[in-house]
Amino acid sequence: MKLSLSFFCLLLSSVLLSQEHQVRFDQIDVVHYEFEMELNDENDNIDATASVSLIFKEASTKFSLDLVGLTDGKGMTVKRVLTAKNQELRFEHSNDLLTIYTEQAAGASGTFIIEYSGIPKTGLIIAKNKHGDRTFFGDNWPDRGKNWLPIVDHPSDKATVQWVITAPDHYKVVGNGELIEEKPLGNGRATTTWKSTVKIPTKVMVIGAARFAVEESGKVRGTPISSWVYPQDEKNGFHDYALAVSITEWFINTVGPYPYAKLANVQSKTQFGGMENASNIFYSENSVRGDRSAEGLIAHEIAHQWFGNSASEADWHHVWLS
């Protein structure tokens, strides 16, 4: 009886969530996100500006994005919302929804700038790794991205994304897509920019920042494949993750062209054994052993670049695909 009741509640929650998102799908189409974010070593607070570009499918007076609000010291606080022309807009932030008021005609497009800050409850894992070094890893699957990003947090809602991450310069930053720039600021900090011109779901839209040793393992059909591991695990990590080259080649020959600009294989603090983030897979930090025992895990996560990322779920009841 308890099991049946729990299943019914879960089913009802899924139905209501799907209905809520369907209203948004009928109203707006997000085409691009840009996240500018400041990370620091003093505390777990992030300061961020999100630029969300979208098209209005129907005449609207408001629209909503998912963003977890502040409770018990954690969550995001929105400072202000602006248009691309620097006009302040009225907004409400409650029940983990950011509602922005704006008069728009059907077919109109616009970019909306959201300034916010806070300590993520989850979604962005800020923690010491097994060697005691501080790290930052996005861990959005399946719907935890809204804990640190204002987004339409649904597996079928794809958009392009650009990350502009400023952090202490002892960190290397990895993100979706192609590396655009690494810019030292001369004050012990640096800004790293990554951009995906391929639309991806928010569940696999992430960055990672840590002390990394990085090696290009090889190229397959022009696609660079790299390994990002903790410096203490450099020898074993490069040996283990180099398997990704032959595995990726097999999938390209068997399935079809690789869908993204690169493939980075990253030792991380993900709560999962592995997480198939688009073009930068995050593996458990314990996946590095030096004996290539993670071959099955690596193949599994690389397969998701096609199945789960490029071909993604239409709704929550399909989430088994990833």
Q: Model-found features: residue ranges?
A:
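Bacterial Sec-dependent N-terminal signal peptides
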Residues: M1-Q22
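N-terminal, polar/Ser/Thr-rich
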Residues: L16-S51, I55-K57, K130-T135
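Glycine/proline-rich low-complexity spacer/linker segments in large multi-domain proteins
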Residues: Q22-F25, A106, E115-Q162, E215-S217
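Surface-exposed beta-strand/loop patches in extracellular or lumenal glycoproteins
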Residues: S51-D72, L149-D153, V161-P168
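Aromatic/His-enriched, Gly/Pro-containing loop or helix-boundary segments
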Residues: K62, K79, K85-A106, D139-K146, ...
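A surface-exposed beta-strand-loop module
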Residues: L70-G132, G188, T193
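Catalytic Zn2+-binding segment of zinc metalloproteases
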Residues: I302-H318
